[in-house]
Amino acid sequence: MTGEKSTIETTIAHYKVSKKVLSESSPVWDASLRGHFRESRSSTVPVYFGTLKSLELWFRIVHNVMVDEMHDLQVVDVYEAIEVCGNREWDISKLSKSSWAREWMNRQKYRELDLNAMSRLIYIAKELDFPREFMYMTQKLVYGTADHIKDRNPTKHQHLHLDHTIIRKLAHYSYSDQFLMYSADALNGAKGNLRCKILKGLFTPVGVFLQQSCECKKDSLFEYCKGLSHTGIWPLESHMKNSAQEILDTFDEFECDKPENACYKCLFRLSDSSIERTGNQVQEHFDGLCLDCMSVSKPKDGKDVDAAYWQHDTLKQYSRGCRVQHDQPTWYWSFMGRRTQMQAQQVARQR
């Protein structure tokens, strides 16, 4: 016994490839196959990275010999393919712009996925540049997640994740008149903002009742609070731990009796339509994140945010030039620049 550890190599697959095609597909392959490495003088090149399917996917893409079974790859293998992309310095656009990518995403049936599955797919949707799918899934995660929103990488390559400006491990919220200030990541900030809007919509009428001069306001306020209790909003501290969507879904339970002496102002605020209006406004508030707004607002090479991003706000055309239609909240939360820049823009906008 020498005390030295021994290793046994086992070949688990063979791929027949063109050395010329591989060399032309990436500088790393070119250096290893045409340079002074041992592989350049051999007809067999050992590969120690990736998975069987992730490597096969790349080899088929660069050789342009796709087969249908590649469109049914597991999410984990696509993560591995993205990792291989960095390892071999393959241009990821070869993957994202391929016909394979579109068909693979179509087969994911992303609209039918649960939130956990969406949290595994959003990173791929961003890396492979699927704006509609990314927007839809980020919207669903913001409305449907009760706890901190995370992207879930199912592989050991945990460096493959969304940028911290999109999802951060920890978020700290501070409320301003119109928005949660940009102290949280985009998705969790948008989620917190929805909850603030729900609270504001539900409890603003309480302050209005108190300011009225009518004699019926006391009885009307009591009935309004009873109506809110039917939705399960109380106890508030436990109910607000639910997702925004779970809270909004309880609005259908709002119902209150009308005091016999109630004036028309009180009757209006006691009507189902007041709660329904709040529910509709919050439900339609956030469209999800926009990849195009994210791209144009992310500073490049130390430069400031592209002027085209701020122009959206100036012109009130928030999805101008974007591949998906959206409103102002999506534009705001898709901002990838420095927080101080957005804060300064919001202050200037309110002058």
State where each predicted segment sits.
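Acidic, serine/threonine- and proline-rich low-complexity regulatory tracts
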Residues: 98-101, 105-351
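Canonical BTB/POZ domain core
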Residues: 2-110, 203-252
